[in-house]
């Protein structure tokens, strides 16, 4: 991404941050405390209640929440906040994370939210202000001279979230569309491109090569940075990851493309159908626009059909430089909902 003169100044010098953070003041109805690693079940239950308003078709699993709180570079007691009501029930949480080892962009992510039945009472404003201060502290602790973004995502169907971010100074920067495809009516898989390409199910021995290919394939994607080994391993070790439903494209022993799949059966009742989620789709640059992504996706959809899944779901950056949206719609995917990526640039 382009580097400005401002970006050449170390973050420690260009970001103003509070020297210390205090917990928000308690009230007659609400109490605040820092997050703990053992809060995963409590926060998962809260996230499920939030999802009814924000994204009714899915919610974070307990394993995903544990992973978020237990990463080596996350300290929930310093980076997280929990709000409870007078009875001790969780009504809001926030987590601030800065992934390690950026190459061209330092990113800080703000996650969390407020139970819909407690919105409109100032909890979200208090939470977001604290998170933003913590994000600035993280940036100001870095000696890197790189562009830096503080980022958060909001669902269009819950406009109060986007309005809250805008009030804090965030701008709507990018749109991500959720697409669905009826597996039974999907177009058949096309042939793999010429050049000795073979498409195989994901296997453990391919894992590191797929991670490297992922980083190469996503190098020119908006907001993307290389995924480290810890993050990658956490992803493929989640119970929802499905190696037999994921596909890898190889030329000799080189990974040139991939599609990863996840299945969370807990989401099926709320969706009204069985589904697989396509998490990552990528081809390394020399193999783009040769039909490889379509062939990989077709192979994955065939695997979904054999597994008895009714629909495939994925999310796509609507302005992706790879033309991914056109690839998906050509296969029979149709848009359903949309999320907005908000950011503040430092």
Q: What is each residue range found by the language model?
A:
Residues 2-68, 191-227:
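Short amphipathic alpha-helix that is part of the acyltransferase structural core
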Residues 297, 320-324, 341-346:
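Short glycine/proline-centered loop/turn elements that form peptide/ligand docking sites
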Residues 110, 152-153, 278, 312-316:
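Conserved hydrophobic beta-strand within the GNAT/NAT acetyltransferase core sheet
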Residues 120-137, 280-283, 289-306, 311, ...:
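Conserved acetyl-CoA-binding loop-helix of GNAT-fold acetyltransferases
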Residues 161, 165, 328, 333:
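Conserved active-site tyrosine of GNAT-family acetyltransferases
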Residues 47-143, 151, 251, 256-273:
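Conserved donor-binding loop and adjoining core beta-sheet/short helix segment
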Residues 61, 185-276:
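Flexible, substrate/cofactor-facing loop regions flanked by secondary structure
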Residues 1-24, 98-195, 340-344:
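Acyl-donor-binding surface of acyltransferase catalytic domains
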């Amino acid at each position: 991404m382009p580097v400005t003169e401002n970006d050449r100044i170390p973050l420690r010098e260009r970001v103003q941050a509070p020297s210390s953070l205090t917990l928000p003041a308690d009230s007659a109805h609400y109490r605040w405390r820092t997050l703990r690693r053992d809060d995963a079940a409590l926060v998962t239950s809260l996230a499920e209640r939030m999802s009814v308003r924000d994204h009714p078709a899915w919610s974070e699993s307990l394993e995903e929440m544990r992973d978020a709180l237990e990463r080596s570079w996350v300290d929930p007691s310093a980076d997280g906040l929990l709000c409870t009501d007078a009875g001790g029930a969780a009504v809001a949480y926030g987590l601030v994370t800065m992934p390690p080892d950026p190459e061209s962009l330092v990113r800080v992510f703000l996650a969390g939210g407020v139970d819909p039945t407690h919105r409109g009472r100032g909890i979200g404003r208090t939470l977001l202000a604290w998170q933003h201060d913590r994000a600035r502290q993280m940036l100001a602790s870095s000696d890197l001279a790189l562009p830096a973004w503080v980022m958060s995502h909001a669902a269009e169907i819950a406009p109060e979230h986007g309005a809250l971010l805008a009030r804090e100074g965030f701008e709507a920067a990018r749109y991500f569309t959720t697409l669905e495809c009826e597996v039974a009516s999907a177009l058949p898989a096309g042939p793999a491109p010429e050049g000795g390409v073979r498409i195989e199910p994901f296997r453990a021995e391919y894992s590191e090569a797929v991670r490297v290919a992922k980083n190469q394939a996503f190098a020119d994607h908006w907001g993307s940075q290389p995924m480290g080994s810890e993050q990658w391993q956490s992803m493929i070790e989640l119970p929802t990851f499905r190696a037999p439903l994921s596909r890898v494209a190889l030329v000799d022993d080189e990974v040139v493309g991939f599609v990863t799949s996840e299945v969370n059966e807990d989401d099926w009742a709320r969706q009204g159908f069985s589904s697989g989620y396509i998490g990552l789709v990528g081809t390394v640059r020399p193999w783009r626009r040769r039909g490889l992504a379509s062939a990989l996706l077709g192979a994955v959809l065939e695997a979904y059909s054999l597994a008895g899944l009714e629909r495939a779901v994925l999310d796509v950056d609507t302005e992706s430089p790879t033309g991914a949206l056109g690839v998906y719609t050509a296969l029979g995917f149709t848009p359903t909902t949309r999320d907005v990526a908000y950011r503040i640039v430092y």
